[in-house]
């Protein structure tokens, strides 16, 4: 939130009309936005700010329907019996929670099941963490950065034959998933 705060202060001096902000994870972002943008309208992109109380912050948010994304992944994975591992960015992220809820809901009436979850911590090598997990048939990666990291390593068959499914928007992620 500290970097966002500096950018917001800098842009206020440029007489901007409004902000479009991709919020940093953490509970301090909500308070920072209230203070820094009290007189300037803003819209959040990708996801709402985190609140320890949970729920919606009341801020306008534009972003993908993560529940539907998770649900669609679940429909695909539920077509055959599979043990699934899930890699996500941050346990408290609403987007990750929604995607996991959609995935679980779609898998309810199938023979597929989620065997483990792996959440990234700051500056953590996600490849090392995932490679220590139990063998699964498929790995669902909800963190675009982790998807790129894991995709780069998949050429070496480092996931014991597991197929990788994921959410990503970069050309690199698309190529690695192909």
In which residue ranges do the predicted regions lie?
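An alpha-beta-alpha
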Residues: 68-116
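Short helix-capping segments at alpha-helix termini
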Residues: 38-39, 105-113, 154-160
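Structural motif
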Residues: 1-15, 115-133, 147-149
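Solvent-exposed loop/turn segments at secondary-structure junctions
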Residues: 25-28, 48-52, 90-94, 120-123, ...
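Flexible loop/hinge segments that line or gate small-molecule binding clefts
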Residues: 29-68, 168-178
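Short beta-strand segments enriched in small/hydrophobic residues
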Residues: 1, 23, 60, 83-92
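Periplasmic-binding protein-like
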Residues: 15-24, 42-45, 85-88, 114-115, ...
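Exported/periplasmic ABC-transporter solute-binding proteins
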Residues: 138, 145-147, 152-178
